[in-house]
C-alpha cells in the first residue's frame, strides 16, 4: 500500500499508539515523502509533530525521454560524452541485459569498484551503501528488478539495477556503477539501461545523493524536473 493512501493513516495511528502505550516513547518517522506528509497534515495527525526537510534524502525526478535521447541544449555535454565514448571504444563494447546467472561476475566487478573508491571515501559513504547493494544482488531471484550492463572486451565494466512502477510510469534507478576512468561510460549506461529495460517509462527516479557533493552535482547536471522532498517527522518532547 502506498504511503499516501488512506490505509497509511491507519498504520500511522496504530504505530503511534504502540510507541506510546507499549514502549512509552515518542514516535519519530524518517523519509516521509511530501504527499504523505500533506495527507497526514490534512487529517490532523501531525499537530504535535515537527517536520524537517532532509535535503540529503530528496529524490531526483527526470523526464525519461530526455535521458534516453539526450536532446536539447541542456543535454549537449552529456550527448558529446556519449558520442566520444562510442567513437573511442567502437567495436569493443556491448550492452547486455543481465540476470541472476551474471550475479557472481557483477559482484566481482563491484568489489573491484569498491576497492578503487575506498581510498577517496572520507565519510564511509561507500560502506554505508554496500549493505544495500549486496542485499539486492543476493536476492536476485526474489526481487522484481531489472539489471543491465556494459561489457568491454568481454568483461563487465558497468552495471545498473532498477525497477519499474507501471501505475505511475516511473523507473527507479537503485544502483549504477561504472569504471570511472572510461570517459562517457556512466553517461552511456544511464541512457542504454532506460532504452532497453524501461522503454515505457515517462519518468525516472534516480533517488537521493546521500549528501555527497560530487553525486549531487552529477544528478543536478541531468536537469531534474523536480526534487521529491523527504521529511523527518518528530514528535514534540
Question: What does each model-identified segment do?
Answer:
Residues 36-52, 80, 210-227:
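Conserved active-site alpha-helix within GNAT-family acetyltransferase domains
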Residues 25-43, 56-58:
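Short, glycine/charge-rich beta-strand/loop segments that flank catalytic centers
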Residues 45-121:
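Acyltransferase donor/substrate-recognition loop-hinge adjacent to the catalytic core
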Residues 13-25, 192-199:
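Short, basic/hydrophobic alpha-helical segments
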Residues 145-236:
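Aromatic (often tryptophan-rich) hydrophobic motifs at membrane interfaces
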Residues 1-8, 12:
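Single conserved hydrophobic/aromatic residue that forms the stacking wall/gate
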Residues 22-33, 199-207:
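Conserved GNAT acetyl-CoA-binding A-motif
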Residues 93-179:
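A conserved beta-strand-loop-helix scaffold within acyl/acetyltransferase catalytic domains
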Amino acid at each position: 500500500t502506498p504511503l499516501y493512501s488512506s490505509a497509511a493513516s491507519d498504520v500511522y495511528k496504530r504505530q503511534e499508539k504502540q510507541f506510546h502505550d507499549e514502549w512509552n516513547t515518542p514516535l519519530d518517522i524518517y523519509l516521509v515523502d511530501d504527499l504523505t506528509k500533506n495527507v497526514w497534515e490534512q487529517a490532523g495527525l501531525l499537530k504535535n509533530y515537527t517536520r524537517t526537510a532532509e535535503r540529503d534524502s530528496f529524490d531526483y525526478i527526470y523526464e525519461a525521454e530526455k535521458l534516453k535521447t539526450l536532446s536539447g541544449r541542456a543535454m549537449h555535454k552529456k550527448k558529446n560524452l556519449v558520442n566520444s565514448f562510442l567513437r573511442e571504444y567502437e567495436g569493443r563494447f556491448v550492452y547486455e541485459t543481465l540476470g541472476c546467472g551474471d550475479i557472481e561476475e557483477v559482484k566481482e566487478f563491484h568489489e573491484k569498484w569498491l576497492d578503487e573508491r575506498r581510498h577517496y571515501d572520507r565519510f564511509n559513504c561507500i560502506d554505508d551503501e554496500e549493505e544495500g547493494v549486496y542485499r539486492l544482488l543476493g536476492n536476485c531471484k526474489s526481487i522484481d528488478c531489472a539489471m543491465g550492463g556494459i561489457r568491454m572486451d568481454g568483461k563487465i565494466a558497468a552495471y545498473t539495477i532498477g525497477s519499474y512502477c507501471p501505475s505511475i510510469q516511473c523507473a527507479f534507478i537503485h544502483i549504477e556503477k561504472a569504471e570511472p576512468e572510461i570517459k562517457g561510460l556512466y553517461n552511456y549506461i544511464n541512457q542504454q539501461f532506460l532504452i532497453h529495460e524501461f522503454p515505457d517509462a515517462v519518468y525516472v527516479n534516480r533517488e537521493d545523493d546521500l549528501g555527497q557533493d560530487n553525486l549531487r552535482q552529477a544528478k543536478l547536471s541531468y536537469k531534474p524536473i523536480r526534487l521529491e522532498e523527504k521529511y523527518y517527522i518528530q514528535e514534540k518532547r
